[in-house]
Amino acid sequence: MTVKSIRRAYHVIRTALHYGLDDLLPPKLTPWYFKLLRYCFFWLRNQHKDKVGGERLKLAMQELGPVYIKFGQMLSTRRDLLSDEWAEELAMLQDRVPPFDSAIARESIEKELNAPIERYFNDFDDTPLASASISQVHTATLKSNGAAVVLKVLRPDVEKKVHADLLLMSQAADFLERLLGANNRLRPAEVVEDYRTTIEGELNLKLEALNAIKLRNNFIDSNALYIPYMYEELCFTRLIVMERIDGIPVSDKVALEAQGTNLKLLAERGVELFFTQVFRDNFFHADMHPGNVFVSREHPNDPFYIGLDCGIMGTLTDEDKRYLAENFLAFFNRDYRRIAQLYIESGWVSADTDVGAFEQAVKVVCEPMFNKPLDEISFGHVLLELFRTARRFDMVVQPQLVLLEKTLLYIEGLGRQLYPQLDLWQTAKPFLEQWMAEQVGPKAMAAKVKQQLPYWAEHLPELPELIYDNLKIGRDLSKNQNKLLDRYLKHQQKAHKSNYLLITSAILVICGTILLNQDATLWPSYGSIGIGITLWVLGWRSRPKNRKI
């Protein structure tokens, strides 16, 4: 470790102790000498004993800076690991940092463009439109067509700072993992690795641009979602240029009501958009918090969403989608046995899991939910409780499902904020049933056959040769099996004959020796011994040789 990283580690530990985070660890992890070392090296006591654990963790992460703030925000979505109280505390973390010098921003932009800003842009505004922990946004006008655009540029040296903090987090997680043991529910190393994947994706702005282009193409003719245009030729790893949009933040319900927005339709479209992205396109926006979602000012009676920041996207396999859809349908049919079977069939939990015990655990969690009307049941909450239950049966973490659960909770929260009477089940059920019918019905079978036709057309001419080769192999195998069987039988016959001669010779020699000791007539005793020795020699010589059959 470098001096700089040691200093950073010291600061992180000191901050954690200042907020008494060590008090939140189980007693077996903090023996008497731990407190002694704490006072010797840091001279610190818990300064926030009056605050609950979740609030102390939030304050510590806030003080440690942007990387830890984003980590806290990510943790707030892992409600399969944290209690609701802790998750709600961490959800209040705000990714707001002072802007960096516009001269440095200009320098970074020109380095990516490999040209002066004035070559491509007019009216570049040195005052940033927004500033966050990873990047900063400036406005300008595109010189080529006069379009209003925004330039998003990474903060200077942000990659080094992020990787340095990630290294510390990984080391701390590994240490905690060893302390907590293999059966711990929190799995800190797994959580940090999940965060690493997320934040490293946000450090590559070119990837964000490509994601936005793909999502835009998926909804190019949609009346429900608009994704701003990306100027791909001006997009790089540390800089992207995109169309500037004018919309109302989805969280500003007062402004939406003031312009007469159809909030019921807007809320229902949000749910439909989510399921369309997941089940139709298999490519969904996984960071749809209110700061990334706007509503168009155009035709409020037929409103549509505007989506920003496509740095974090999710995908599911076809199997994941099928199991997920069946899970929801099984839940609303109260078929808990089927839910347990689906988790095992999908490989999310081990094949040797006790299905009956899992079914009962699911029933205990899910059955009370039906005390509420269907329109009040939360899809995200259902998924969350199922994941929490599955974790008790050693569910293998599924990062794509964690992203899905987080996004679903966001979508539900937004939908019910816009229109509290939103019935998610009535909105989603027809979509899920139609998708399932398309996957398992005659049309699905025909589509799969059609999809495989080019493959079979290419390989069909090889079929006669393959059949001939397989028949020949079968015939040769049959011949070889017969030969092996004959050799085995002969080997066994020789072995039996040899064993018979050796046993007989031993009996004759023993009998001859007994007769000789009893002073009997000599010739029978010597004859018995002689024949026995002869048979022993014959038996020994007739033994089958030890070679492979």
Swiss-Prot record:
Is probably a protein kinase regulator of UbiI activity which is involved in aerobic coenzyme Q (ubiquinone) biosynthesis. Its EC number is 2.7.-.-. The chain crosses the membrane at residues 498-518, 520-540. Belongs to the ABC1 family. UbiB subfamily. It is a multi-pass membrane protein. This is Probable protein kinase UbiB. GO terms for cellular component: plasma membrane. Residues 123-501 form the Protein kinase domain. ATP binds at residues 129-137, 152. Pathway: Cofactor biosynthesis; ubiquinone biosynthesis [regulation]. GO terms for biological process: regulation of ubiquinone biosynthetic process; ubiquinone biosynthetic process. Keywords: ATP-binding, Cell inner membrane, Cell membrane, Kinase, Membrane, Nucleotide-binding, Transferase, Transmembrane, Transmembrane helix, Ubiquinone biosynthesis. PANTHER family: CHAPERONE-ACTIVITY OF BC1 COMPLEX CABC1 -RELATED (PTHR10566), PROTEIN ACTIVITY OF BC1 COMPLEX KINASE 7, CHLOROPLASTIC (PTHR10566:SF113). The active site is at 287 (proton acceptor).
